[in-house]
Swiss-Prot record:
Gene from which the chain derives: rplM
GO cellular component, one term: cytosolic large ribosomal subunit
Pfam assignment, any one: Ribosomal_L13
Family the entry assigns: Belongs to the universal ribosomal protein uL13 family.
Keyword set includes Ribosomal protein: yes
Protein name from the UniProt record: Large ribosomal subunit protein uL13
Task of the protein: This protein is one of the early assembly proteins of the 50S ribosomal subunit, although it is not seen to bind rRNA by itself. It is important during the early stages of 50S assembly.
Keywords: Ribonucleoprotein, Ribosomal protein
Organism expressing this protein natively: Syntrophomonas wolfei subsp. wolfei (strain DSM 2245B / Goettingen)
């Protein structure tokens, strides 16, 4: 019996909606990263993008445990000398709550070409509305 290797053309992609209301950032992000990679499928192949599309709604209602709202910092670089920008997560969740989930999920994906193609399948929205009704996404409840 030969080992099965998925080919990009034969991957059937589904759309899932995940509600982030009152979910912990890290636990939600690890579950989303697993779906984006395709680890929930029996055809999972590490070097092929076998994952599904994920829509995360209510990103503004995400929770952080402990005092991470004040202590944890979100950093990004503008590309210019001295361009390191830093803000705490309380400010980030007020200004751009989608960015908190995107950054957490991106850190859990492969840091290469494959990971960059996987992150494009993640759609995050701060409210409960999203423009992807035509794809007929199914609601997915998280474990735990």
């Amino acid at each position: 019996m030969k080992t099965y290797v998925a080919k990009p053309a034969e991957v059937d992609r589904k759309w899932y909606v995940i509600d982030a209301s009152d979910k912990t950032l890290g636990r939600l992000s690890s579950e989303v990263a697993s779906i984006l990679r395709g680890k929930h499928k029996p055809i999972f192949t590490p070097h092929v993008d076998t994952g599904d599309f994920v829509i995360v709604i209510n990103a503004a209602k995400i929770k952080l445990t402990g005092d991470k709202l004040n202590q944890k910092k979100f950093r990004h670089h503008t590309g210019y000398p001295g361009g390191l920008r830093e803000m705490d997560y309380r400010t980030l969740l007020q200004k751009r709550p989608e960015k908190a989930i995107e950054a957490a999920v991106q850190g859990m994906l492969p840091h290469n070409r494959l990971g960059r193609s996987m992150i494009k399948k993640l759609k995050v929205y701060s409210g409960s509305e999203h423009p992807h009704q035509a794809q007929k996404p199914e609601l997915r409840e998280l474990k735990g």
